[in-house]
């Protein structure tokens, strides 16, 4: 993987990631394909909405169907028939989400499989092996996601454990041509975030992610970390904000120098009838749309908006038809990709401030301050 920084506008960055399997223009949003599928989307649909890279879930694919099944097809790209780049998370966040079902030790994490209840172990070496078997283009280190809230002592112990696991991940990754990203932890504590960053830079990674956000903290806390941390990340490496978020969060992340994002929100919200439009959120199951012949968003060029009315999408939602979720997902993911395209063009032209002003004006919201 190579990363080129092509333009800046304030803290915002316009870049390009180049992989053997394709080019990713940044800032970029990665649709989430947890089980080897972006829910409701054929691979050709993912390509059609403009996605250049997707995210796969190491933890879930390891448990089911298992890497031995996937490897018989070649790798995850062959298994799911997506031939662009894939970033795989390490499984650390999913283990974190198990709560009382897992026990964290120095060697790794012991837990009961959510698939069949079997006792399972995953550590840095296992995570790196699974991601190698998946043929990931970007591999994430195995880490512990610091919970929120966490006092300084809890956050410190978690961060230091993640640093030790980062070193083991780097060693276990040797010989794998894929890019390896470190993950900055430390909770909401700036001094711990800096210590994590220093430790990761000493180990050496191809890119750095910000973890431990979007885990229940107030929006103000997330923004505080994003005001503080990205300017301190190395300028010559991609910066990835994990698990975030709403369109507004993407805009605020880009304004602060983030290059890569992922989140289940556009696909999950699509299945619940919450659709993103330039003016905000449209709830398609509301009765007001029953006779509405207009498209979801006249400004959108997705297949859904070009061919179907709000009334039809409302009807599908009320009937529980799977086509409704599919069309909604196409629209939401295209909305996110259109947003990223607009951000890239604005940075390239030195017009990000005007883009941000228009973005918030359409939503009837004030522009948040940028420190």
UniProtKB/Swiss-Prot annotation:
Domain of life: Bacteria
GO biological process assignments: queuosine biosynthetic process; tRNA wobble guanine modification; tRNA-guanine transglycosylation
GO molecular function, one term: metal ion binding
Needed co-factor(s): Zn(2+)
Active site positions, chain numbering: 89 (proton acceptor), 262 (nucleophile)
Keyword terms: Glycosyltransferase, Metal-binding, Queuosine biosynthesis, Transferase, tRNA processing, Zinc
Cross-referenced InterPro entries: ArchSynthase1/Queuine_TRR, TGT, TGT-like_sf, tRNA_ribo_trans-like
Catalytic activity: 7-aminomethyl-7-carbaguanine + guanosine(34) in tRNA = 7-aminomethyl-7-carbaguanosine(34) in tRNA + guanine
Subunit relationships: Homodimer. Within each dimer, one monomer is responsible for RNA recognition and catalysis, while the other monomer binds to the replacement base PreQ1.
Family listed: Belongs to the queuine tRNA-ribosyltransferase family.
PANTHER family reported for this sequence: QUEUINE TRNA-RIBOSYLTRANSFERASE
Name of the protein described by the UniProt record: Queuine tRNA-ribosyltransferase
Species for this entry: Azotobacter vinelandii (strain DJ / ATCC BAA-1303)
């Amino acid at each position: 993987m190579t990363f080129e920084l092509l333009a800046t506008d304030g803290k915002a960055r316009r870049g390009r990631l180049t992989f053997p399997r394709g080019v990713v223009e940044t800032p970029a949003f990665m649709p989430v394909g947890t089980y080897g599928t972006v829910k409701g989307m054929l691979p050709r649909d993912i390509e059609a909405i403009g996605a250049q890279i997707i995210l796969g879930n190491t933890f879930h694919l390891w448990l089911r169907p298992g890497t031995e099944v996937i490897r018989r097809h070649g790798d995850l790209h062959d298994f799911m028939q997506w031939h662009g780049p894939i970033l795989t998370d390490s499984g650390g966040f999913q283990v974190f989400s198990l709560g009382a079902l897992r026990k964290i030790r120095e060697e790794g994490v012991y837990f009961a499989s959510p698939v069949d209840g079997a006792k399972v172990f995953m550590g840095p070496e296992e995570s790196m092996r699974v991601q190698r078997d998946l043929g990931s283009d970007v591999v994430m280190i195995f880490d512990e996601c610091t919970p929120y809230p966490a006092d300084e002592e809890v956050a410190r112990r978690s961060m230091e454990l993640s640093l030790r696991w980062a070193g083991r991940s780097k060693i276990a990754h040797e010989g794998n041509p894929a890019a390896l990203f470190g993950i900055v932890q430390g909770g909401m504590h700036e001094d711990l975030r800096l210590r994590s960053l220093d430790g990761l830079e000493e180990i050496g990674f191809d890119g750095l992610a910000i973890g431990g956000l979007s885990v229940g903290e107030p929006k103000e806390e997330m923004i505080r970390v994003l005001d503080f941390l990205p300017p301190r990340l190395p300028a010559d490496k991609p910066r990835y904000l994990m698990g975030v978020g709403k369109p507004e969060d993407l805009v605020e992340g880009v304004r602060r120098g983030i290059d890569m994002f992922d989140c289940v929100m556009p696909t999950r919200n699509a299945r619940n009838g919450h659709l993103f439009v330039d003016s905000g959120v449209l709830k398609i199951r509301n009765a007001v749309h029953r006779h509405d012949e207009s498209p979801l968003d006249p400004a959108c060029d997705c297949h859904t908006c070009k061919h179907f009315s709000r009334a039809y999408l409302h009807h599908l939602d009320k009937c529980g038809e799977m086509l409704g979720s599919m069309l909604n997902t196409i629209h939401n993911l295209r909305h996110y990709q259109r947003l990223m395209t607009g951000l890239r063009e604005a940075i390239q032209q030195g017009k990000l401030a005007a883009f941000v002003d228009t973005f918030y004006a359409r939503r009837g919201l004030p522009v948040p301050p940028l420190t």
